[in-house]
């Protein structure tokens, strides 16, 4: 009987160690540093991959100016739609080490494609390959930081650096 119990315990431990953690489907309401408010849905599929779709008011430009005697900032928003394929890089590694992976807390590589619409009706299409870190906390909250390049494809091609900090609510 002792051998049976020990072998069952060994099988349970081995199964839990070999378990694959997958990203989770979730709905979010989030804002970026500066301006914007978006509703998003993350659909998990195929192992560590997911697709994030967001719609809402998107932060288009966030400009900081600083001088000897003043500090100014400006931000503009416009309606927009974002579709972002994501690949979570270290989710299994984090799970094997007992780290928190709830709410898709892991490092990721993503390619957000954003279409924004200005007041003159002319749209802008931006494709932005980014590396990021997402962490969930307090069960329903998350924050993520990503950096990469903004490749503005429409109306003309322009490449600029991209840094984004997002905080939001998971439900």
Describe the residue ranges of each PLM region.
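Outer-membrane beta-barrel "beta-signal"
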Residues: 79-95, 159-171
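Short glycine/proline- and aromatic-enriched beta-strand/turn motifs that initiate or cap beta-hairpins
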Residues: 19-70, 112, 117-122
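Short loop/turn motifs that connect adjacent beta-strands in outer-membrane beta-barrel proteins
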Residues: 20-25, 48, 90-107, 137-142
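Outer-membrane beta-barrel translocator domains and adjoining extracellular loop/strand segments
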Residues: 64-69, 98, 122-123, 155-161
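Membrane-embedded beta-strands of outer-membrane beta-barrel proteins
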Residues: 39, 83, 129-131, 147, ...
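Bacterial Sec-dependent N-terminal signal peptides
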Residues: 1-25, 167, 171
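Residues that define the transmembrane beta-barrel architecture of outer-membrane proteins
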Residues: 23-37, 47, 75-81, 107, ...
């Amino acid at each position: 009987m002792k051998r049976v119990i020990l072998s069952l315990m060994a099988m349970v431990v081995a199964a839990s160690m070999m378990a694959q953690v997958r990203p989770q489907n979730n709905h979010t309401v989030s804002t970026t540093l500066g301006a914007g408010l978006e509703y998003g849905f993350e659909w998990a599929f195929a192992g560590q991959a997911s697709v994030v779709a967001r719609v809402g008011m998107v932060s288009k430009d966030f400009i900081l100016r600083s001088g000897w005697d003043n500090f100014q900032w400006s931000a503009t928003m416009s309606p927009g739609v974002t579709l972002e394929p994501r690949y979570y890089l270290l989710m299994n590694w984090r799970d094997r080490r007992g780290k928190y992976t709830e709410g898709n807390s892991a490092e990721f590589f993503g390619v957000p494609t954003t279409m924004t619409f200005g007041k003159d009706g002319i749209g802008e299409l931006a494709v932005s390959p980014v590396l990021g870190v997402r962490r969930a906390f307090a069960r329903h909250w998350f924050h993520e930081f990503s950096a990469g390049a903004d490749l503005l494809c429409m109306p003309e091609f322009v490449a600029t650096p991209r840094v984004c900090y997002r905080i939001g609510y998971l439900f």
